[in-house]
Amino acid sequence: MARWDNARNGDLYRNMIEKIKAAGGVRAILWYQGCADADAKNAAQYAESFARMVKDTRRDLGEEIPFFTMQPNRYETQPDAASWGIKEIQRRSALTLEKVHILPNAGLPLSDEIHNSSAGNVTLGQMLARQVHGTLNGGLPFEAPDIKNVQLENGNIRLSFRHVSAFTRLRPLHDAADFCLTDDLGKNEIQSVSVQEKDLLLTTARSVQGKGYLSYGAHPQGPEGAIVNQQTYLPIISFDHVEVSK
């Protein structure tokens, strides 16, 4: 990210601005970056650097140009799950910055341990095309389910989301493995995930003790992306360390 941040290195940023101006401008910017910053040191600076790049781009191009961002896929040999909080930083950036959108990148095929395959990139391009069309040209909305609330309910945990008409499962996988719940006693195993129209209901191995925090797909190997919105077939946007309300 440092090479895209004018306050740090910024060489790639300056090259981008030069090429956009030479081409006469663009209607939007597609942003797919983050794997190189999936470590504790770089991730800590990512939110500030990305926000500064968006601000600088709009200033230098003289318009409130929209950004369409994508979370990283997965890193099959990366053991440090904590570093992949970068996905949560990207999710929150789309919530807090004007005209910044985000798509998940769950379950797409890889060509190696980290990079999308050609087939994966084609699928990602199709998703982006639909989102850009829906946003810029007045087409059908194409936003992925995004966590809105995590609430204790009769000993279970109910999840509600933005941008969902109803959930469905594409295939019978072990969805519980994509979630991680921690509380004052440490890890609390998710035993099952049930679809309840627009919500998901999680059952846990024990009651939540003290403060609880839930993550989904924030680990390097996931998520599978088997639970999708029926209308768009988009999977849930990965989130990390969202507090459980009581």
Each model region followed by its residue ranges:
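Cell-envelope and extracellular/periplasmic
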Residues: 1-246
